[in-house]
């Protein structure tokens, strides 16, 4: 009897050891799919999310093997930094410029033009345009602040740069206040080194509402999607709309190739996906395009009890939706100001048959997480990129590097965000760039 008991105990112990080893193996194997490299840039302001809001466009950009980034330091000064992609060492400069970091809308947007000059815009929330560019090619030292065209530059919010395949640079922003703003688009020509107005009112809120958009540049043109907001209250967000330009932003059309009469209004906008008000529909997320030029729009809203990430995409002329359903705790989006939300807005990428979502979720410990699915299977897998919390971080990635080399570099900082534009009391946190060496491909 004792021998049988000892033998059973040994077998049980052996099985448990094997199970532990097996689990460890699978954990290591899963982690091996996401080998990362981290480089530290410097200490940044972290009492709110101004350094990491998703609508920076861009926080990180690469031009000819030189990667640039920008952030506010603990004193609210703009820090510009660059490195060679083969190095973890960053060259930094504290500029003479600063911003009102107490408002998380006042983010920094950067781009490098085709002549290798750095362009920077910052510190704007229904305030005057703030813009400067580097004195030298690939330089970090900025010249004097300047206007672009002088028109529609007194009430600027959400500045963002976009590089076009033809070498021109786009600058987009909202002119006017929340709930009654219009979309402005300007174009920079490297030959003349001058800005011109491309669209003085691409999307018109008709003084009744605002469009909150995201932009993607693909080989075939410029893609824009947006939600409408009927007031300052985020709960009035509704509908996901769409437009495309094949000529650098001069003319726009629907997915059916029907030409828009500009400006686009609520009555004329193509609705890619109908979402009613009070659905906790988030604004200003991300979009991408596949090799065939089909757009993919990421977001989240509540259509079944709990807000979940979703992807709306175009395939063979028809709009489709992919759901996720891993978030378990309900929450409601409502009110104004920068919100403290349990999940970040998502960033989306696609490569061949694979679709990727980059996000943060309190239920996963506020770590940076990568979701992946094969479009043929539509089964999601989730892997944490970091082993530590990044607080109220939202994803910003190097889109130029991704488009050129399919390499994923992420701007990262552990930040806080009190609800409604409040401030936390946090020690300055390190700004990092995280490189994912190999993405899941099945």
What are these regions (language model features)?
Residues 11-13, 28, 217:
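Secreted/luminal cysteine- and crosslink-motif detector
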Residues 16-22:
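Sec-dependent signal peptide recognition
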Residues 23-24, 304:
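Amphipathic, positively biased hydrophobic alpha-helical segments used for protein targeting
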Residues 1-15:
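N-terminal secretory signal peptides that target proteins for export/translocation
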Residues 10, 22-23:
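A periodicity- and composition-biased signal for non-globular, repetitive helical segments
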Residues 9, 18, 29-30:
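Prokaryotic Sec-type signal peptides and long signal-anchor helices
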Residues 24-32:
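Hydrophobic h-region of N-terminal signal peptides that target proteins for export
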Residues 33-442:
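Extracellular, repeat-based ectodomains that mediate carbohydrate processing or recognition
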């Amino acid at each position: 009897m004792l021998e049988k008991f000892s033998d059973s105990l040994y077998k049980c112990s052996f099985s448990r050891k094997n199970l532990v080893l097996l689990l460890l193996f699978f954990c290591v194997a899963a982690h091996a799919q996401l080998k990362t490299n981290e480089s530290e840039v410097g200490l940044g302001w972290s009492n709110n999310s101004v350094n990491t809001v998703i609508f920076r466009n861009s926080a990180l950009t690469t031009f000819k093997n030189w990667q640039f980034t920008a952030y506010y330091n603990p004193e609210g000064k703009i820090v510009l930094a660059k490195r060679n992609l083969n190095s973890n060492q960053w060259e930094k400069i504290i500029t003479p410029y600063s911003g009102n970091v107490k408002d998380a809308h006042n983010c920094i947007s950067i781009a490098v033009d085709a002549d290798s000059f750095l362009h920077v815009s910052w510190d704007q929330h229904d305030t005057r345009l703030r813009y400067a560019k580097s004195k030298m090619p690939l330089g970090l030292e900025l010249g004097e602040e300047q206007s672009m065209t002088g028109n529609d530059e007194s009430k600027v919010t959400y500045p963002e740069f976009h590089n076009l395949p033809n070498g021109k640079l786009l600058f987009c922003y909202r002119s006017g206040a929340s709930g009654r703003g219009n979309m402005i688009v300007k174009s920079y020509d490297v030959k003349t080194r001058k800005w011109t107005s491309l669209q003085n009112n691409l999307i018109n809120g008709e003084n009744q509402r605002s469009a909150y958009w995201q932009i993607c540049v693909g080989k075939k043109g410029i893609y824009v999607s947006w939600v409408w907001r009927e007031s300052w209250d985020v709960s009035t967000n509704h509908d996901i709309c769409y437009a495309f330009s094949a000529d650098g932003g001069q003319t726009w059309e629907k997915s059916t190739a029907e030409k828009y009469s500009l400006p686009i209004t609520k009555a004329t906008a193509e609705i890619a996906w109908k979402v009613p008000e009070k659905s906790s529909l988030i604004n200003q997320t991300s979009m991408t395009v596949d090799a065939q030029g089909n757009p993919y729009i990421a977001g989240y809203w509540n259509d079944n009890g709990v807000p979940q990430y979703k992807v709306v995409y175009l395939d063979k002329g028809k709009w489709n939706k992919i759901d996720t359903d891993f978030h378990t705790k309900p929450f409601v989006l409502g009110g104004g100001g920068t919100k403290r939300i349990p999940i970040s807005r998502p960033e989306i990428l696609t490569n061949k048959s694979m679709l990727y979502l980059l996000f943060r979720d309190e239920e996963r410990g506020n770590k940076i997480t990568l979701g992946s699915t094969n479009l043929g299977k539509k089964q999601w897998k989730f892997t944490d990129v970091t082993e530590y919390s990044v607080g109220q971080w939202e994803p910003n990635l190097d889109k130029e590097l991704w488009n050129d080399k399919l390499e994923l570099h992420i701007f990262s900082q552990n930040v806080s965000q009190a609800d409604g534009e409040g401030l936390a009391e946090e020690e300055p946190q390190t700004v990092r760039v995280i490189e994912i060496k190999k993405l899941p491909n099945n």
